[in-house]
C-alpha cells in the first residue's frame, strides 16, 4: 500500500496494528498519534488480533502511563504516545514498568523541553532524560523508519 503520511501517522498506523490497549493523553507534537488511535478505535478498526483497540483517555501523562502499566499487568499489549514534558512526567512509572520487565511501548514525538516558553523545536533532551529508566530506545530518521520501528518496538 502506498500512502503519503507524516511520522505521527506512520507510527500510529503501525502501533495500532499491534496494540490491545492504548492509554492516551494528547500532547503536542504527538497529539496526532493519540487522535488517530482514538478515531480508529471509535470506528471499530481491528488490530492484527481481530479486535478494536481498547482506548483509555486519561487526565494527565502520569495517568496515561499508569493506565498503560495497569494494562501490562493484566497481560495486555499496551502503548502510549507522548512528547517532551509529558515524557518526563512518565519517568517514575517507567522505572516500575522496566523493573517489572513489562513490554510496554511509549511512542515519543521528541521536542525541546521548554522552561519559560512554549517551543516546538526538535531535539532529544526529553528522551535523554529517560535513559536511566531501563527502557530501550529506538529512533527513526525518516517517516518510513518511524513506521518500521513502531512495528519492531511492539
PLM regions and their residue ranges:
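Thiamine diphosphate
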Residues: 1-129, 134, 151
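Structural signature of the thiamine diphosphate
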Residues: 137-154
Amino acid at each position: 500500500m502506498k500512502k503519503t503520511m507524516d511520522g505521527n501517522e506512520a507510527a500510529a498506523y503501525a502501533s495500532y496494528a499491534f496494540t490491545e490497549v492504548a492509554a492516551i493523553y494528547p500532547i503536542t507534537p504527538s497529539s496526532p498519534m493519540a487522535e488517530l488511535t482514538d478515531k480508529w478505535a471509535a470506528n471499530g478498526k481491528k488490530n492484527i488480533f481481530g479486535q478494536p483497540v481498547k482506548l483509555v483517555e486519561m487526565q494527565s501523562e502520569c495517568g496515561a502511563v499508569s493506565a498503560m502499566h495497569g494494562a501490562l499487568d493484566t497481560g495486555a499489549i499496551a502503548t502510549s504516545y507522548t512528547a517532551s514534558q509529558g515524557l518526563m512526567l512518565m519517568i517514575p512509572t517507567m522505572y516500575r514498568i522496566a523493573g517489572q520487565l513489562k513490554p510496554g511501548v511509549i511512542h515519543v514525538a521528541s521536542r525541546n523541553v521548554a522552561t519559560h516558553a512554549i517551543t516546538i523545536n526538535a531535539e532529544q533532551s526529553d528522551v535523554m532524560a529517560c535513559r536511566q529508566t531501563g527502557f530501550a530506545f529506538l529512533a527513526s530518521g525518516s517517516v518510513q523508519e518511524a513506521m518500521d520501528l513502531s512495528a519492531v518496538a511492539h
